[in-house]
Design a protein with these regions (language model features):
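Conserved Class I S-adenosyl-L-methionine-dependent methyltransferase catalytic core
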Residues: 2-94
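Class I SAM-dependent methyltransferase SAM/SAH-binding core
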Residues: 95-97, 109-153
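Glycine-rich SAM-binding Motif I of class I
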Residues: 104-108
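A short acidic, Gly/Pro-enriched loop at the edge of an enzyme's catalytic core
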Residues: 153-163
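A short SAM/SAH-binding and catalytic strip from SAM-dependent methyltransferases
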Residues: 161-175
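A short glycine-rich, Lys/Arg-flanked "PGG" loop and its adjoining helix->strand segment in the class I
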Residues: 176-188
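C-terminal alpha-helical "lid/dimerization" subdomain adjacent to the S-adenosyl-L-methionine
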Residues: 195-250, 257
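Core SAM-dependent methyltransferase catalytic element
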Residues: 252-272
């Protein structure tokens, strides 16, 4: 924290850094969305979706750049410590699934911080998995990471200490089915970390700069992506916490709590 001379207001330096980076990455995302207009417009007319793999090719790296500042500033220092007993497990050596990992930004940050643990990134988009493998090699974390093509309802394994979903549950066609699969893939004392865009339970709670940003991106990217999949729940990037909790508990989780938050994200922890 920093306090300006003669002022009682405190400024979070990490948040300023994050906002500066975010303002730059937003431009990339807006360009990617614009490049995809010809595919999204018919979906508005016929009620269908646009598959994630059919998005503009610049969308995938733009999304990775968009979320990276928040993950760099908060994931290891705040979000993981807010989970019940997870950091101790990671320090000793845990097995972690990062589902919907994209280019592997979140996976690599955790792998660097906890070299004794094994991190497996899963994504249903083959090109993103190939990019994640390349990034892991470039960043020197190939020893305790690997990346595989799989969906949130069929990734292998039933012995994970931690399963993490970073800003992707709302993009899935069948989030309740994904929740049920996570529940089956965890150890009895395992945890599911769900990082989702910050949203209030009422529309008027979200009429702010962050909410407007997420509503726009959700309309053009998140909802069409979900509608293109089986079930097509279309939660959207402003799915409120009550709705997320309903999805999580429908998957078999009994304990759900908000573990941490930032102006841009809420972090939920679910346990069987």
């Amino acid at each position: 924290m920093h306090r300006r001379a003669g002022s009682s207001r405190q400024i979070d330096i990490k948040l300023i850094s994050c906002i500066r980076c975010l303002s730059q990455t937003i431009l990339g995302c807006m360009a990617a969305i614009h490049a995809n207009l010809e595919k999204v417009q018919p979906a508005f007319k016929n009620g269908g979706g646009v598959a994630w793999g059919d998005q503009s090719t610049c969308m995938f790296c733009a999304v990775a750049r968009f979320f990276r500042p928040g993950y760099q500033n908060h994931l290891v220092s705040e979000w993981l410590p807010a989970l019940d007993g997870v950091v101790v497990k990671l320090e000793r050596g845990a097995r972690v699934a990062d589902v919907g990992c994209g280019h592997g930004v979140s996976t690599m940050l955790m792998a660097k911080a906890f070299p004794n643990s094994e991190f497996i990134g899963y994504d249903f988009h083959p090109s993103s998995i190939e990019a994640a493998k390349a990034h892991a090699a470039e960043n020197g974390v190939s020893a305790n990471t690997r990346f595989e093509v799989a969906t949130a309802t069929n990734y292998p394994g039933k012995d994970f200490d931690l399963v993490a979903f970073f800003d992707c549950l709302h993009d899935m066609g069948d989030p309740a089915g994904a929740a049920a699969h996570v529940c089956q893939s965890l150890k009895p004392d395992g945890s599911w970390m769900i990082v989702e865009p910050m949203a209030g339970d009422r529309l008027e709670d979200n009429l702010n700069p962050v909410g407007r940003l997420y509503y726009g991106a959700s309309t053009m990217v998140c909802v069409p992506t979900s509608l293109a999949q089986d079930v097509g729940a279309a939660l959207g990037a402003q799915g409120d916490e009550a709705r997320l909790r309903a999805v999580i508990t429908a998957g078999g989780f009994r304990n759900v709590r908000r573990a941490a938050e930032t102006p841009f994200n809420m972090i939920l922890e679910a346990r069987p």
